[in-house]
Amino acid sequence: TVTLPPAALPLSGTLAGGRLTIEGQAAYSGGRLTSYDVRPTGRGLALRYPEGVRSLLDAQLRLFGDAEKQWITGTVDVRQALYTKRYDVASELLGARRALPLPDSTALEEGPQLDLRVRAPGTVRIDNNLATLAASADLAIQGTTRAPVVTGRAEIERGRLYFQGRTYVIQRGALDFVNPRRLDPLFD
């Protein structure tokens, strides 16, 4: 059995143009990880994921668990985010008609438990063929990595929506994520 005390291996460096520090501990026995408690902290991380999204964020996370159960907790503060991916309505409609494959048994495994807060105080922008808008969000992400659940609120502060050759001015809008069992937002 090997146990690394909390201050044994602090790591710090640069990741995605920002500063990343990782502290924590891990225990190994029989060549396997038996428990861990790791705290990554990122400041000014510039990400280009998923496709069409550029963001600058700060994060304080905690990853901990053992062979039976794992957790990912913490806070992500979005300093800037821009979504530019073009949206093809025809492809989406045709894609919706295809039958969805049933998940295999490995996809039904739980995965780590989530307890995350994502804060974006007026720092989210969308600029693509469907909309130009500014938004803010305060969201909680819970559930598991295989079945995440989002609760909270996202507010559209201003913008324009482009549909069938017309431009619609958005004065305000909101998405309320109130269903703790599935992603089912209410639009206002």
PLM regions and their residue ranges:
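Strand-loop-strand
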Residues: 1-188
